């Protein structure tokens, strides 16, 4: 058996890092499905994987060491992907938040400086119910959130294109796709639609509550009750009559 030697102790390869849990099947409403992001992932980062399995197993994550994309960008990870969603609609607008989990967020190869185990990144589709299309798109970027008008966003049909991207010497976030992103860099070289689970699509509320209350350290999931309204408030496009707290 091959293994990893650490201070003279041989750790079996199977125990060196835990594989992510299995994903949940697609379970989302028409609105959430229609305006979900079309995803790609730059080569210097991880693929989005499940944060929780059907049996309630939480993702263990990875130490931010080794290669920046080490142990988290295999085709098997891409095949076992997941997106979580939560929406709020009022005053003619719907904000649909899409949350993606990554096993680590590493800034520099070989060392953990500036990085952390676990990463949560979010994309918000702002849908005008009159036009029935995404008019604005927001992405979380480190500790901030940036909102873009439709004119700056590329689409795959009704789906805004975003790319999980390493920000220079810093860590990762979702950026808008651009003309250099064709074809996508993932193993299949196409835009990806991980199985989507919306707020009302969970197999049980207890499984949803387990994820929403889990501690991911420096990474925070922003579709739980404690952070959802604040995220919408910070991301809301100026001038639209949407109430993030309604």
Place the predicted regions along the sequence by residue.
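A domain-level signal for the mature, folded cores of soluble proteins
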Residues: 17-121, 135-246
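Short beta-strand micro-motifs enriched in acidic
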Residues: 126-130
């Amino acid at each position: 058996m091959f293994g990893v030697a650490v201070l003279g102790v041989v750790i079996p390869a199977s125990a060196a890092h835990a594989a992510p849990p299995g994903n949940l099947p697609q379970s989302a409403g028409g609105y959430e499905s229609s305006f979900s992001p079309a995803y790609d992932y730059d080569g210097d980062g991880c693929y989005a994987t499940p944060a929780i399995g059907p049996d309630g197993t939480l993702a263990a994550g990875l130490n931010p060491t080794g290669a920046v994309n080490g142990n988290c960008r295999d085709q098997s990870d891409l095949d076992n992907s997941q997106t979580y969603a939560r929406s709020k609609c009022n005053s003619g607008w719907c904000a649909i938040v899409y949350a993606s989990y990554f096993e680590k967020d590493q800034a520099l190869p070989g060392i953990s400086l500036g990085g952390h185990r676990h990463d949560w990144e979010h994309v918000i589709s702002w849908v005008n119910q009159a036009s029935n299309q995404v008019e604005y798109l927001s992405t979380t970027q480190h500790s901030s959130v940036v909102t873009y008008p439709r004119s700056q966003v590329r689409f795959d049909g009704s789906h805004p294109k975003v790319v999980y991207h390493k920000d220079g010497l810093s860590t990762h976030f979702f950026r808008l796709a651009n003309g250099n992103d064709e074809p996508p860099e993932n193993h299949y070289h196409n835009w990806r639609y991980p199985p989507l689970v919306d707020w009302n699509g969970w197999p049980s509320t207890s499984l949803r509550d387990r994820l929403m209350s889990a501690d991911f350290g420096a990474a925070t999931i922003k579709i739980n009750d404690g952070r959802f309204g604040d995220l919408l408030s910070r991301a809301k496009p100026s001038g639209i009559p949407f109430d993030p707290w309604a």
